[in-house]
């Protein structure tokens, strides 16, 4: 096992990365190794998808499957080894079918890629794990060095984050052939074990630029189906009655669940990154969408144990449900998996609803505590002139984009302290689950404009980018000249690709934490600092002083 993709990876003087019987996320060495094997199979599939496009062959089954299966290897998504192997077998079957299509057009069709003809050696998981050793990401570290390995992983993990957003967009009916062609090209190239530093740096920027387009179509899918988010108050306390909790990012799953629970007497609560759903008109119209439950994903083993109903996980993040003994009432959807947990293959939630009706639910309603969400792209753009007016009248000094992933590390209290230290004449724009560090606190307003503005999920960084570009255009300056600073927390690969997106668009002087990614060497961090001004957090006092004086 070797995995260094998330923020909680093991860090020692001898090197970084989880390389024991189990990773810090709870992933076993077996599952981790089989995910490496799956990635190799997907790289071979992408190699043939690139070749097929040369012949004008576009296989939509391949295009929809490839990012989805890649998504299953993202942190805290799928811990079920047999399902990972199933994805690998499906990847190889699709590759062979695509290869046959190419050969039907050109009998001499060939692909020069080490993954292009990969076959699984056995049905036995142990044998497959031994085969996977051939594809361990750091297998040639001694030959290439840590810097090249780090750049490879930056690209691989960034592309994995983009693949997750591609799947979210695909579920909503969004497809862009150029994006998929670019994805396959990069994925196939990474399967050749590239070792050119400049090429890898260029690739990382290409991934960021591609992801900006992905976020654009995801935004179109969400707003096209469910309307543009508008500011909405959400109760974060319990309401009496039967209940279901839904977590993850998939708004379509939430919509289907709301439709199927309507009139059943079962209330629905969002959790984690599903909180922004309350801002969408077509979702909040369901009166039994009664609120949001819990805090950051890392607290789920305590909070889910206390929730008196079933739980549905639609995407990341899931962690061991046996710890809180709720594994008999947590359900997985789509690419999510945990051994022994029931999985929903389709859109039918009837079994979950039946379980909810059989459980006690909340016995009484708590005193409501309302927070505000729903500052989507349209709302943000509508406030652009107000923001400019406040700045011109010196009522608004600075905007801090304070968001990203949450996690268990104690140093993450920095982000709570930073938020509470932001001066009263400054505004906090937040997104993603890092907001749970401070989104239930009171921040007041500036002439009626809330000082805490929740823009949505992690992918809604797109809205923040569009707002920044709009403000810069209206003020006749560059984005980096705005009174705007980005202080971002990271945990997994979606955060990595958001960072690459911002860097590829030329955004500079981003501050990140709580730690630097374990796969980035001091040399690589120095390069990113020199090129983009990217740096790690220090203390709240020092960072606040520096950012306000910039």
From Swiss-Prot:
One of its GO terms (cellular component) is cytoplasm. PANTHER family: HYDROXYLAMINE REDUCTASE (PTHR30109:SF0). It is found in: Cytoplasm. GO terms for biological process: response to hydrogen peroxide. Hybrid [4Fe-2O-2S] cluster binds at residues 249, 273, 317, 405, 433, 458, 492, 494. One of its GO terms (molecular function) is peroxidase activity. Binds 1 [2Fe-2S] cluster. [2Fe-2S] cluster binds at residues 3, 6, 18, 25. Keywords: 2Fe-2S, Cytoplasm, Iron, Iron-sulfur, Metal-binding, Oxidoreductase. Signal peptide: none annotated. Its EC number is 1.7.99.1. Belongs to the HCP family. The modification Cysteine persulfide is found at residue 405. Its cofactor is [2Fe-2S] cluster; hybrid [4Fe-2O-2S] cluster. This is Hydroxylamine reductase. It catalyses: A + NH4(+) + H2O = hydroxylamine + AH2 + H(+). InterPro entries: HCP/CODH (IPR004137), Hydroxylam_reduct (IPR010048), Prismane-like_a/b-sand (IPR016099), Prismane-like_sf (IPR011254), Prismane_a-bundle (IPR016100). Catalyzes the reduction of hydroxylamine to form NH(3) and H(2)O. CDD domains: HCP.
């Amino acid at each position: 096992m070797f995995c260094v993709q998330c923020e909680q990876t093991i860090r020692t003087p001898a090197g970084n990365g989880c390389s024991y019987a189990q990773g810090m996320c709870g992933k076993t060495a077996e599952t981790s190794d089989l995910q490496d094997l799956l990635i190799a199979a997907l790289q071979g599939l992408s190699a043939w998808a690139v070749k097929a496009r040369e012949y004008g062959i576009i296989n939509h089954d391949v295009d929809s499957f490839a990012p989805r299966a890649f998504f299953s290897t993202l942190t805290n998504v799928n811990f079920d080894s047999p399902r990972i192997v199933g994805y690998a077998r499906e990847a190889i079957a699709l590759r062979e079918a695509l290869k046959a299509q190419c050969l039907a057009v050109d009998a001499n069709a060939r692909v020069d890629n080490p993954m292009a003809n990969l076959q699984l050696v056995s049905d036995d998981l142990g044998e497959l794990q031994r085969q996977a050793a051939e594809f361990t990401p750091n297998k040639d570290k001694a030959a290439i060095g840590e810097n090249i390995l780090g750049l490879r992983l930056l690209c691989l993990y960034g592309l994995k984050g983009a693949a997750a957003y591609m799947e979210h967009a695909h579920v909503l009916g969004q497809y862009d052939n150029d994006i998929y062609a670019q994805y396959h090209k990069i994925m196939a190239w990474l399967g050749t074990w590239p070792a050119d530093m400049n090429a890898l740096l260029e690739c990382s920027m290409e991934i960021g630029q591609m992801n900006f387009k992905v976020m654009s179509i995801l935004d179109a899918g969400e707003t096209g189906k469910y309307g543009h988010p508008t500011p909405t108050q959400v109760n974060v306390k319990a309401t009496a009655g039967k209940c279901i909790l839904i977590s993850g990012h998939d708004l379509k799953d939430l919509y289907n669940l709301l439709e199927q629970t309507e009139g059943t007497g079962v209330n629905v609560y969002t959790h984690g990154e599903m909180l922004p759903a309350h801002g969408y008109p077509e979702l909040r119209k369901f009166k039994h969408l009664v609120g949001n439950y819990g805090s950051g994903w890392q607290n789920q083993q305590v909070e889910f144990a206390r929730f008196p109903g079933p739980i549905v996980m639609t995407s990341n993040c899931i962690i061991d449900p046996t710890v809180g003994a709720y594994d008999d009432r947590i359900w997985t959807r789509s690419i999510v998996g945990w051994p022994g947990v029931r999985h929903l293959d389709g859109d039918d939630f009837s079994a979950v609803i039946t379980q909810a009706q059989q459980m006690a639910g909340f016995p009484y309603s708590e005193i409501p505590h309302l927070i505000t969400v729903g500052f989507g792209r349209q709302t943000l753009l509508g406030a652009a002139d107000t923001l400019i007016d406040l700045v011109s009248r010196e009522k608004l000094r600075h905007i801090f984009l304070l968001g990203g992933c949450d996690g268990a590390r104690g140093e993450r209290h920095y982000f709570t302290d930073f938020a509470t230290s932001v001066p009263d004449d400054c505004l906090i724009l937040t997104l993603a689950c890092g907001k749970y560090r401070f989104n239930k606190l009171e921040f007041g307003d500036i002439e009626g404009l809330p000082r805490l503005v929740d823009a949505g999920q992690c992918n809604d960084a797109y809205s923040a980018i569009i707002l920044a570009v709009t403000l810069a255009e209206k003020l006749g300056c560059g984005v980096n000249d705005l009174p705007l600073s980005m202080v971002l927390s990271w945990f997994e690969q979606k955060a990595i690709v958001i960072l690459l997106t911002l860097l590829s668009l030329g955004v500079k002087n981003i501050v990140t934490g709580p730690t630097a990614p374990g796969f980035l060497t001091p040399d690589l961090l120095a390069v990113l600092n020199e090129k983009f001004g990217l740096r790690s957090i220090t203390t709240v006092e020092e960072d606040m002083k520096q950012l306000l004086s910039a």
